[in-house]
Amino acid sequence: MSGASARSLGKGSAPPGPVPEGQIRVYSMRFCPFAQRTLMVLKAKGIRHEIININLKNKPEWFFEKNPFGLVPVLENTQGHLITESVITCEYLDEAYPEKKLFPDDPYEKACQKMTFELFSKVPSLVTSFIRAKRKEDHPGIKEELKKEFSKLEEAMANKRTAFFGGNSLSMIDYLIWPWFQRLEALELNECIDHTPKLKLWMATMQEDPVASSHFIDAKTYRDYLSLYLQDSPEACDYGL
């Protein structure tokens, strides 16, 4: 089965056939923020695509031929070419399908987006540390670190004086960082942005974007998924289906 809401393929499953003509395939997982980056770029650019969900707690043997690390997202085109790593997949899509560019053409503006992305670079690992922290006493320290990182982004937004990180319209940088902001409420980390009014305004604007909002997962569903995932349950990736 394929599609955003299709059940995931696990150990013992048959590998999918060739990628349909005129499409590109993405190997994904419904709750993965890294895969969400790629899915949002596909949707924002209007690229016809096929979604194959992978059970990351019960990975199919054949999937390691697509990515030796066994991680999503992975892109596969009709030539059988494979592209891994979320940021690389997004940049590939922007160049391979140039009709609606998400990165700016101007080299300096593109460099500015990449520099802003570096300001965000510690956030995913800090969020993962928070999720995996076995002792509640460790949470305040991680939250303080997150507040520092969000302060850097608040300053960048203040200096930019635009609605989005790349200007007055949505662009690649906004999609690359959005999945982690979207999960703050579910993770009960909203307090980490209490001191960043411009970031909060940006988040409210992002929630109105049809591409960003199409990947909305309600807080309870996400928390229930996480509970199963942290128990290494093979049912985690298909939770709610």
From Swiss-Prot:
Glutathione binds at residues 59, 72, 85-86. Residues 22-101 form the GST N-terminal domain. The modification N6-acetyllysine is found at residues 57, 143, 148, 152. GO terms for biological process: cellular response to arsenic-containing substance; glutathione metabolic process; L-ascorbic acid biosynthetic process; L-ascorbic acid metabolic process; regulation of release of sequestered calcium ion into cytosol by sarcoplasmic reticulum; xenobiotic catabolic process. The keyword Acetylation applies. Its EC number is 2.5.1.18, 1.8.5.1, 1.20.4.2. The keyword Secreted does not apply. Residues 106-228 form the GST C-terminal domain. The active site is at residue 32. Belongs to the GST superfamily. Omega family. Homodimer. This is Glutathione S-transferase omega-1.
